[in-house]
Amino acid sequence: MSQKTQLLVEGAVVIALATVLSFIRIIKMPWGGSVTLLSMLPIVIYSIKNGVKNGLLVAFVYSLVQFGQGVIDGLFGWGLTPGSLIACILIDYIIAFTVLGLAGLFREKGLSGWIIGTVLAIVLRLFMHFLSGVVIWKSFGELWGGFATENTVLYSLLYNGAYMVPEIIF
């Protein structure tokens, strides 16, 4: 099997595995996001094994799959304006999941590089969800007694950190 074919097959397998794991939700947040059974791990390992370029490509495809899952979960039922919806798709799905491909950034540095790259990629994903919470989803904080409208940054950090920090740890 040629190297390109092997990369393609491995990429398809890790996307499928990550998708299956993303459906195993340990904690599901009320307005999106969840703690899953290591769903980012296959993408991260692929990036570390095959490099950032290939990792970003596979992570981008995974982001499209996650967007599809978001549609199934009711993304279009949240009443977003067209502009907010486009921003949500870009920030919460395309960019947030594509950055997982950066896990292989320090792969040549051995185990410490793998850990640093993985944490960096997941923290960047957390940052994208945090940014989305501040810019797009701030009005949903009113469901918490107005907390978010007064403290949008803190609300977004707490909400998104509640599911992303466990994902970093596991």
Model regions and ranges:
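Loop-helix junctions at membrane interfaces
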Residues: 1-170
